[in-house]
């Protein structure tokens, strides 16, 4: 729990003083508890909740000014390079990294639930073949509550925990199938002899005709890091959506489906896809210099550089760049678009205009390049983001349900018509 500092903020309102308690977390700025303002007949006004803490949480801490991202106290770069994704999942869910024995047990639990009910596979046939994979994901993830309804008592901790495992285990299967369905290929089932990232890539790219298909270990490691680097990011739009939906008592599958819907918005989950679209618009390496001049003149936007939260650098980007270099070296790809991206990076890291404004490449810039190099189409980028973020969403959902909570009910500043009568 947060602790009262003993300090109070004083609000002068209509000739009266309202004392508002100030609380401290373990890290980050103090917060002012404004709920007593309601008794005065007033609301606070904070569009976008930019200065509002909607909850207490022990899961993730971000200091955007210093470029810090911690999961349960551990720096993200350490988790991405010294732990794997499922260890990070265990950490987010339980608060501590697993012991060797706990890791074996947790990995086995996840493997045991990677299959989905056979009727779920038929559910895909209701979608058009040209449907966006995110549209499919919203539908099939929400529909899981119709197939696993025997464990939906959100007051039962055992039901909550098994649902968390099921979501982490089944989302990669559904994500890969959403791709297979849109390209008209048979579904590939998960294999218990593969790790989490290998399994996903196998379900994405293996076919019944290619029995010798093997996942490149460099690509599996890269995918695992992408999953880890996107596992959670505090109270962002989609996580807040999951919490808000969860506050109504909605089942967890519905809540995660709501999170996927929020993530689908281009302002949230579409950043790495936007990077590839920008590269398409630039066209060739020869056009990069002129494009960057247009950026300076504010004629076009530079996607994948800078970050809304991180004012200095994105702590995930260094690991992602290293991973990007490893993937491109391993594949030896001669892709004009990747060469174009590298030229963008070179200019941004050396041009004083971008350096002074701290417009460094962020995680979305490098992840987009990696996913393209692996062979994943751009419409699947946000699906992979949703796959990785599922553990963050369900961790916040579990945290909220572990104690007392209130249904979310934001207020508004009404600017419409005053009361009037119908006149006929």
From Swiss-Prot:
The active site is at residues 307, 364. It catalyses: oxaloacetate + acetyl-CoA + H2O = citrate + CoA + H(+). SUPFAM superfamilies: Citrate synthase (SSF48256). One of its GO terms (molecular function) is citrate (Si)-synthase activity. Its EC number is 2.3.3.16. GO terms for cellular component: cytoplasm. It comes from the Bacteria. Belongs to the citrate synthase family. Homohexamer. NCBIfam families: cit_synth_I, PRK05614.1. Citrate synthase is found in nearly all cells capable of oxidative metabolism. This is Citrate synthase. It comes from Acinetobacter calcoaceticus subsp. anitratus. The gene is gltA.
